[in-house]
């Protein structure tokens, strides 16, 4: 049997109990990842959730706003989806859905923001 290691990231779920640990980018296993994408998601609007997360090469986490009222309040989430790029625990950029509740950002825009954050952190 041939096994091929996967270097990509999978979409995970977070809630009020672990969101801060995830956003900080610190791993218990010593594999720190400073950039993290968090999507504040709502079941009623699943059709408009960001669907290309498998194409992003950094951790991608969803937070169910119905189950995470503290995180929703702290990050001022009013609409879902709201997507935030964090860099070492700090908000780098936020994309918020409008009244149409459509996903507010494209894969290309997220990739560009990640590239800019990576370049800025090199200095």
Where do the model's predicted regions map?
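N-terminal signal peptide c-region/cleavage motif recognized by signal peptidases
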Residues: 3-5
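Boundary of Sec targeting at the N-terminus
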Residues: 9-11
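Local sequence-structure signature of Cys/Sec-based thiol-disulfide redox active-site neighborhoods
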Residues: 13-57
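Short amphipathic alpha-helix with an adjacent loop that forms part of the alpha/beta core around
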Residues: 26, 74-75
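Thiol-based oxidoreductase modules, predominantly thioredoxin-like and allied folds used
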Residues: 39-44, 56-70, 77
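Extracytoplasmic/secreted cell-surface and envelope-processing proteins
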Residues: 46-49, 71, 93-95
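Structural micro-motif
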Residues: 75-87
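Non-catalytic, surface beta->alpha helical segment in thiol-disulfide oxidoreductase systems
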Residues: 85-123
């Amino acid at each position: 049997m041939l096994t091929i290691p996967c270097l990509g990231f999978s979409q995970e779920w977070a809630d009020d109990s672990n969101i801060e640990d995830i956003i900080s980018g610190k791993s218990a296993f010593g594999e720190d990842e400073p950039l993290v994408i968090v999507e504040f998601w709502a079941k009623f609007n699943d059709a408009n959730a960001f669907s290309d997360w498998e194409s992003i090469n950094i951790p991608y986490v969803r937070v169910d706003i119905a189950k995470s009222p503290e995180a929703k309040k702290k990050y001022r989430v009013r609409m879902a989806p709201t997507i935030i790029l964090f860099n070492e625990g700090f908000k780098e950029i936020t994309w918020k859905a409008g009244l149409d509740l459509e996903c507010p950002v494209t894969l290309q825009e997220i990739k560009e923001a990640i590239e800019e954050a990576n370049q800025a952190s090199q200095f």
